[in-house]
Amino acid sequence: MDLLAKASVLLLLLLSLSNAQTDNMEEAENGSSKEEIDESELEDVSSIIFRMNNNSMEELLEGDLVLPKTRNAMKCFGAPDSCRWPKSSNGIVKVPYVVSDNYESDEKETIRNAMKEFAEKTCIHFVPRNNERAYLSLEPRFGCKSMMGYVGDKQVVVLQRFGCIKHAVIQHELLHALGFYHEHTRSDRDQHVKINWENIIKDFTHNFDKNDTDNLGTPYDYGSIMHYGRTAFGKDRKETITPIPNPKAAIGQTERMSDIDILRVNKLYKC
C-alpha cells in the first residue's frame, strides 16, 4: 500500500472516531443513550406506587390508602356514596386544592395537567383554594398516597418528587380522593380475575380483600388506572393477579384514566 492510500485509510478512521465521539457527547447532553430507557416508563401505575411507598412507616390500606384517623372520615370505607365532594348548584363539583411550593414549576405543571383532564371529561373541577375548609393539599412527602373520598377538612395527597410526579400516578391518587377503590377489590372481581394467594407476600394478603362496592353498572376494567398490576405484592415478582378467562389479557395502566374510569366519575357524581 502506497503512502497516499495509507493516509486515506487513516483519515477515514479518524472521521469515524470523531463521529462516534460526537454522538456520545450529544447523548450525554440529553441525559440518555439509545440503550437507556427509563424503567418507570415501562411500569404500570401500581408498580410505581408500591415501589415509591416501599419501607413507608405509615400503615397503608391496599398499598397507598391512608387510614382515616377520625370517626367522621371512616364513613367512606363503609358507604362510598357518603364521601362524595359536594356539587354546586350549577352542576360543577369544585375540589379546592393547594400545591406545595417545594415542587419545581414543571412538576406543578404536570400536576395541573393531570387535574385539567378531569375538567375536560367530567364535572370535577380542581380549583385553587381560597379559604375553603375542605381541600386537597398536594405535598412532596415520602411516597404516593391519598385518603379515600371527601373528609371535610384538609386532606393531604402525597406525591413524592422523582417518582410520583407522573400523569397517571397523580390521577390515580386523585381518584382515591374522589372516593374510588382499586379495581381488583370490586365486589364482582372473582368473575374477572383469579387472586393467586400463594404468591402474595404474607403480610400483604389483606390488600387483596374484596370490598362491598357499588360498581355503578359499569363493567370490570382491566385497563383501569386503579387496577393492580400482575405481580403486585408478589413473592419474587410472581404473578398475584391472573385475568380470567383469558390469562394473557393486559391489565394495569401506564398513561391516564381509562374511558371506564371517566364514566364512573360521571356516574358517581351524576355529571
Swiss-Prot record:
Disulfide bonds: C76-C83, C123-C271, C144-C164
Catalyzed reactions: Hydrolysis of the inner layer of fish egg envelope. Also hydrolysis of casein and small molecule substrates such as succinyl-Leu-Leu-Val-Tyr-|-7-(4-methyl)coumarylamide
Entry GO CC: zymogen granule
Pfam families with a match to the protein in the record: Astacin
Cofactor note: Binds 1 zinc ion per subunit.
Keyword Transcription regulation: no
Subcellular location: Zymogen granule
EC number(s) per entry: 3.4.24.66
Keywords: Cytoplasmic vesicle, Disulfide bond, Glycoprotein, Hydrolase, Metal-binding, Metalloprotease, Protease, Signal, Zinc, Zymogen
Family annotation (PROSITE patterns): ASTACIN, ZINC_PROTEASE
A Gene Ontology biological process term: proteolysis
Positions that bind Zn(2+): H172, H176, H182
CDD domains in the record: ZnMc_hatching_enzyme
Domain (Peptidase M12A) ranges: 72-271
Coiled-coil segments: none
Residues making up the propeptide: 21-71
Xref: SMART domains: ZnMc
Signal peptide as annotated in the record: 1-20
Cofactors, names only: Zn(2+)
Additional record remark: In medaka the hatching enzyme system is composed of two distinct proteases, the high choriolytic enzyme (HCE), of which there are two isoforms, and the low choriolytic enzyme (LCE).
Function: Participates in the breakdown of the egg envelope, which is derived from the egg extracellular matrix, at the time of hatching. Thus allowing the newly hatched fish to swim free. LCE solubilizes the egg envelope only after it has been swollen by the action of HCE.
Family annotation (PANTHER family): DISCOIDIN, CUB, EGF, LAMININ , AND ZINC METALLOPROTEASE DOMAIN CONTAINING, HATCHING ENZYME 1.2-RELATED
Name under which the protein is recorded: Low choriolytic enzyme
Taxonomy of the source species: Eukaryota, Metazoa, Chordata, Craniata, Vertebrata
Gene name for this UniProt entry: lce
